[in-house]
Amino acid sequence: MAEQLTEEQIAEFKEAFALFDKDGDGTITTKELGTVMRSLGQNPTEAELQDMINEVDADGNGTIDFPEFLSLMARKMKEQDSEEELIEAFKVFDRDGNGLISAAELRHVMTNLGEKLTDDEVDEMIREADIDGDGHINYEEFVRMMVSK
């Protein structure tokens, strides 16, 4: 996954890694991670810090080296990309920009995609995604529907 990063991104992440790696030994410990987190206004417990490290500690040595850090950053960026893609997709459906997808908006987009749906089929799609029962699909409902596919 780290292969998808540009040289510029890798250089930026190397700088960030150096900020975490206080003693310059090439690894980030829970202590170093805690120091940086606290400087950013967070107050994680020792267990939370260990969990964060364990999440990316591929070789299981209890610390994060630069390749592990790059892997974490690449994963976070990929999550960010898919979030942006969902927002863009939602905007396509939400034609009037009111933050809700109505049956008419859904029907219009589906028709433009070549899907000829009956009113009942469109209503059924809305009902399936419409968790709060207001007759429209809001962004959270849209995300839940897209992610559960």
Curated annotation (Swiss-Prot):
Gene Ontology CC terms: cytoplasm
PTM per Swiss-Prot/TrEMBL: The pantophobiac mutant CAM2 is undermethylated on Lys-116.
Modified residues annotated as N-acetylalanine in this record: 2
Binding site for Ca(2+) 3: 94, 96, 98, 105
Residues where Ca(2+) 2 binds: 57, 59, 61, 63, 68
SUPFAM superfamilies: EF-hand
Name listed for the protein in its UniProt record: Calmodulin
Binding site for Ca(2+) 1: 21, 23, 25, 27, 32
Residue numbers of N6,N6-dimethyllysine PTMs: 14
Positions annotated to bind Ca(2+) 4: 130, 132, 134, 136, 141
Lineage, top ranks: Eukaryota, Sar, Alveolata, Ciliophora, Intramacronucleata
Organism: Paramecium tetraurelia
One Pfam family this sequence matches: EF-hand_7
